[in-house]
Amino acid sequence: MTIGDNCYFNKGFTLLVHDWVTRVFIYSGREFLPSSGKVTIGNNVSTAYNVTILKGVTIGDNVFIGANSVVTKDIPSNSIAVGIPCRVIMSIDDFHAKREIQCVKEAFDYALSIQQRFKRRPIITDFREEFVLFVDGDSIEQYPEMAELIRFQLGPSYQDYVKHHKALFPSFEDFLNAAGIR
């Protein structure tokens, strides 16, 4: 088995380089036959919960495998793949473009749900992932309560974020106003 760099395997991950069919062979009066195969996982591969990868599979670089998937065949690089059996549903580029649109609506919905559920105005620390929508890279110091979280969330891309990121909304207040929070 080979596993590349920067891989993350979530809870319930199983990797099998063999199967147990040999036991069935033996107890059904058949000859023992080995059953094993190599698994190769590229760089920057992540899985959601309860993913199983079976023998003989190669997964390319920059791949995300969705929850409860069973990978029985090769998955090419730069892919999002899900299902039983696991199959590619879109490229990582297409998924990123889709998320660029969806994340704004989801952030607005989240802001409104805080207001409705807790009967209060959302505060910046409620937004542990959504900060990219309202914190420019060069304005992190304006939000000291978020600085460490932002550094943690961005990991190795932090310096690039600081140098280049321009948020969709000029400020947290502008974000809340766009979400319909007054």
How does the language model describe each region?
Residues 1-58, 84-85, 91-93:
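Flexible, glycine/small-residue-enriched loop-and-beta-strand segment within the central core
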Residues 69, 77-79, 87:
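Glycine-centered loop/turn positions within well-structured domains
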